[in-house]
Amino acid sequence: MLMKGTTTVGVKFKNGVIVASDKRATSGTFVASKSAVKTLKITDYAVATISGLVADGQYLVNNVRTIADLYSLDTERPLSVRGIARILAFLLRRYRPYFLLAQLIVGGVDREGAHLFNVDPFGTLTEEDYLATGSGSPVAISVIESGYSPDMDRESALRLVISSMTAALSRDAATGDGIDVVVIDDRGVNFLSREEISDLVREVLR
């Protein structure tokens, strides 16, 4: 069974990055999973979100996580966020003409600051201030574009991310079953609890 369909978003704020993804995985019109994990930790300061085929995305993230761990052991410093994104892009290009059907958002913080990268199935790599991928991305990106500011603080960025995800959940049939939200700043990767996310959703929908 091919599990796919999703909405993932990423937004840079003044001191970090926030990414989010829904939990629904579909196979055609069938809801294959209501608890799919599409936001995965790579290092203590970087994560990736997956849209497309879940298995392909997980395979790519597992590979780059291993490479990042080996790099850290060898050099005694973490692999940069740009380095992580470049490796993912290389892995995707390596499988041509047999594409891995996954698009990834890579978000994190390193010595150069906060970064947000888009890596598409062809291995194209771009750095952005905000992103949305997956079947619900047209809805999500319209919400983000209407409210984004480069100097947003953490709380404003969180509300914007939650607003974009709730809009996608309400309009896209392949998006649903809750969301995962991760904040990455100079303190590292922080997966928000269910209670924190629920409070934010209630605040946005109030």
Curated annotation (Swiss-Prot):
InterPro entries: Ntn_hydrolases_N (IPR029055), Pept_T1A_Psome_bsu_arc (IPR019983), Pept_T1A_subB (IPR000243), Proteasome_bsu_CS (IPR016050), Proteasome_sua/b (IPR001353), Proteasome_suB-type (IPR023333). It is found in: Cytoplasm. GO terms for biological process: proteasome-mediated ubiquitin-dependent protein catabolic process. GO terms for cellular component: cytosol; proteasome core complex, beta-subunit complex. It catalyses: Cleavage of peptide bonds with very broad specificity. Keywords: Autocatalytic cleavage, Cytoplasm, Hydrolase, Protease, Proteasome, Threonine protease, Zymogen. Residues 1-5 form a propeptide. Component of the proteasome core, a large protease complex with broad specificity involved in protein degradation. Belongs to the peptidase T1B family. The 20S proteasome core is composed of 14 alpha and 14 beta subunits that assemble into four stacked heptameric rings, resulting in a barrel-shaped structure. The two inner rings, each composed of seven catalytic beta subunits, are sandwiched by two outer rings, each composed of seven alpha subunits. The catalytic chamber with the active sites is on the inside of the barrel. Has a gated structure, the ends of the cylinder being occluded by the N-termini of the alpha-subunits. Is capped at one or both ends by the proteasome regulatory ATPase, PAN. This is Proteasome subunit beta 1. It comes from Korarchaeum cryptofilum (strain OPF8). The gene is psmB1.
